[in-house]
């Protein structure tokens, strides 16, 4: 393991991933469930907070579950959960804390440094918010880098001697980014970026969900859109179907006991979805992928024939229709030799390795995603740092007063591509006072913009005659103070052990309640032998006693024992259904059983 450990974290909208450098090579760290990515989902239940896969299973059934919080980063919006307000930074920090803790267990050492990636289109406020989330989680964020840039690092680590023009096509769960890079002599230079902050694999899932809802409504005359349990199963089935259609031409979506009809009979739904239908349903989404690619190429001043490689990033790039579009647009076979779900975290880890001195001969040149300007006379946005300027960067320009004997100037900093300041995003403003009386246009005011390697900007204004100056560091638009950040860190640390204990106990009770309910349902099934029912009833009694006595050691043992029985119970139910496919009354009690069995297999 490297002497100084710096985590590389892909903090994604839908999923996150973490990697580190070991023996000068990046490795992806598995989460506690043995998976190499973790859902970016946080679920609250009283004092219990779940993160990752456990939270994702509650995404629809528990209204106090937060997902896609990344979309709110850098805004003033807060989410209210159980009568408490949380900032996007606090929710993101819970995800980062979870990642940090399981990474430390895998590494076997404490870690307090990280490189975190963000979409190329994240503005200054969103980048600062991401950094704040890391601080709250107990991480020193050594660098914020663009996701496509990190991907290029990952793909380019073994190709440092080849000069190439690269197009990075990054379609994740919630965002779409395109970057054009020039790679030569160990240097990555970002020539242009483009994208869509509200387009990702989740949109393809939603199309299938809508198709399923309509199919069920047409066949059974029932609307399941307000049925939380059914919607959770539809969401899971849609994602599974999308993934399967990347490898096969037809998949069968089977949803037994999805709901009850108006007469109280269970609804068993099954339907085939083929790739051609799926592609037709999502053709408008495919169409939306074209413009950002063409915009990025135009901005880079290159033609598509100049591109040497197209790098595929994000799990959604596995879809054949997406790959076909890339071939159609670029005339190149896309490179997906690395796992698209992991490549960004790998690149972040490589950047961490560079900062820690473990990897040499790589220089990362990132760019500003939008033009940075100040408002001048007439409300005009006068650019100081154009879009796609390499960072870190420092630029200055001399301005003057707009009126005679003007004693002060108000400096307003905006971000965007519009000509008028009012049409762009106001990042901040401050005043330089004490200017000596003089005719308009005579005083010389130097305005200096400085952007560090993380994309965080500071602005300085100086009267060159009096040498009076003032400055501002652009904070996120929500304006978290250092006191607020410190308070969040303190609260997280003070409640760390308590939260872990409560979480474990609540998980046990929830699992026990679910198992008790399932065994009770199976016991009512006529096809289950009486001796098996007696075993189930004894287990129900043991689970109930341990739960009510709050004997969590015993409860954990009983839960593990019953989960083995649960597998057999599911087999009994399946056999009963196969033997009596038309006997709806006999299967009525299986509605709960089927649902609980699906949940338990995920635990």
UniProtKB/Swiss-Prot annotation:
In the record, Phosphothreonine modifications are located at: 175
* Transmembrane residue ranges: none
On the tree of life, the source organism's domain of life is Bacteria
Alphabetically sorted, this entry's keywords are: ATP-binding, Chaperone, Nucleotide-binding, Phosphoprotein, Stress response
Give me the ranges of the annotated region Disordered.
Answer: 573-603
Single GO molecular-function term? ATP-dependent protein folding chaperone
- Name the InterPro entries for this protein: ATPase_NBD, Chaperone_DnaK, Heat_shock_70_CS, HSP70_peptide-bd_sf, Hsp_70_fam
Give the Polar residues compositional bias ranges. Answer: 594-603
Upregulation: By stress conditions e.g. heat shock.
Comp. bias (Low complexity): 573-586
Q: What does this protein do?
A: Acts as a chaperone.
Q: Which family does it belong to?
A: Belongs to the heat shock protein 70 family.
Recorded hits in HAMAP family, A to Z, give:
DnaK (MF_00332)
UniProt protein name: Chaperone protein DnaK
What species was this sequence derived from?
Ureaplasma parvum serovar 3 (strain ATCC 700970)
């Amino acid at each position: 393991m490297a002497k100084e450990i710096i985590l590389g974290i892909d903090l994604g909208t839908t999923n996150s991933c973490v990697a580190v450098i070991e023996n000068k090579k990046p490795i992806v760290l598995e989460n506690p469930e043995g998976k190499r990515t973790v859902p970016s989902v946080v679920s609250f239940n009283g004092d219990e907070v779940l993160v990752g896969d456990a939270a994702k299973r509650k995404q629809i059934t528990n209204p106090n579950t937060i997902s896609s919080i990344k979309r709110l980063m850098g805004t003033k919006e807060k989410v209210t959960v159980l009568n408490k307000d949380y900032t996007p930074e606090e929710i993101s920090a819970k995800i980062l804390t979870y990642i940090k803790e399981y990474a430390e267990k895998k590494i076997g050492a404490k870690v307090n440094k990280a490189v975190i990636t963000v979409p190329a289109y994240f503005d200054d406020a969103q980048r600062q918010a991401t950094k704040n989330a890391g601080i709250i989680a107990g991480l020193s964020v050594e660098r914020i880098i663009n996701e496509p840039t990190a991907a290029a690092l990952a793909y380019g680590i073994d190709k440092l001697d080849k000069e190439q023009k690269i197009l990075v096509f990054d379609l994740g769960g919630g965002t779409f980014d395109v970057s054009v890079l020039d790679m030569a002599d160990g240097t990555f230079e970002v020539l242009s970026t483009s994208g869509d902050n509200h387009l990702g694999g989740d949109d393809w899932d939603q199309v299938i969900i809508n198709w399923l809802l309509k199919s069920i409504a047409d066949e059974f005359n029932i609307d399941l859109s307000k049925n939380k349990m059914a919607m959770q199963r539809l969401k899971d089935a849609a994602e599974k179907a999308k993934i399967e259609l990347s490898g096969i031409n037809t998949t069968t979506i089977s949803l037994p006991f999805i709901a009850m009809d108006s007469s109280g009979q269970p609804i068993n739904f099954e339907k085939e979805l083929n790739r051609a239908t799926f592609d037709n349903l999502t053709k408008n989404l495919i169409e939306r992928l074209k413009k950002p690619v063409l915009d990025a190429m135009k901005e880079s001043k290159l033609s598509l024939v100049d591109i040497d490689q197209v790098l595929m990033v994000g799990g959604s790039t596995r879809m054949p229709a997406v790959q076909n579009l890339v071939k159609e647009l670029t005339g190149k076979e896309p490179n997906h030799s690395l796992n698209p779900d992991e490549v960004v975290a790998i690149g972040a880890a490589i950047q961490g390795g560079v900062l820690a001195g473990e990897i040499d001969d790589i220089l990362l040149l990132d760019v500003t995603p939008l033009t940075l300007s100040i408002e001048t006379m007439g409300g005009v946005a006068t650019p100081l740092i154009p879009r796609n300027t390499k960072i870190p960067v420092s630029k200055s320009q001399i301005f003057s007063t707009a009126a005679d004997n003007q004693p002060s100037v108000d400096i307003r900093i905006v971000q965007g591509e519009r000509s008028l300041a009012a049409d762009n995003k106001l990042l901040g403003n401050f005043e330089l006072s004490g200017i000596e009386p003089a005719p308009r246009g005579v005083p010389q005011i130097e305005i200096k913009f400085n952007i560090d390697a993380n994309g965080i900007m500071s602005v300085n204004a100086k009267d060159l005659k009096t040498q009076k100056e003032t400055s501002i560091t652009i904070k996120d638009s929500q304006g978290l103070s250092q006191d607020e950040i410190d308070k969040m860190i303190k609260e997280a640390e003070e409640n760390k052990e308590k939260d872990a204990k409560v979480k474990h106990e609540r998980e046990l009770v929830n699992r026990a309640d679910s198992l008790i309910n399932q065994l009770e349902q199976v016991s009512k099934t006529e096809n289950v032998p009486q001796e098996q029912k007696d075993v189930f009833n004894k287990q129900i009694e043991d689970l109930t006693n341990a739960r009510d006595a709050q004997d969590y050691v015993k409860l954990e043992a009983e839960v593990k024992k019953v989960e083995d029985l649960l597998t057999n119970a599911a087999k009994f139910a399946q056999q009963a259904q196969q033997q009596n496919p038309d006997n709806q009354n006999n299967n009525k009690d299986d509605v709960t059983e089927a649902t609980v069995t699906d949940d338990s297999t995920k635990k």
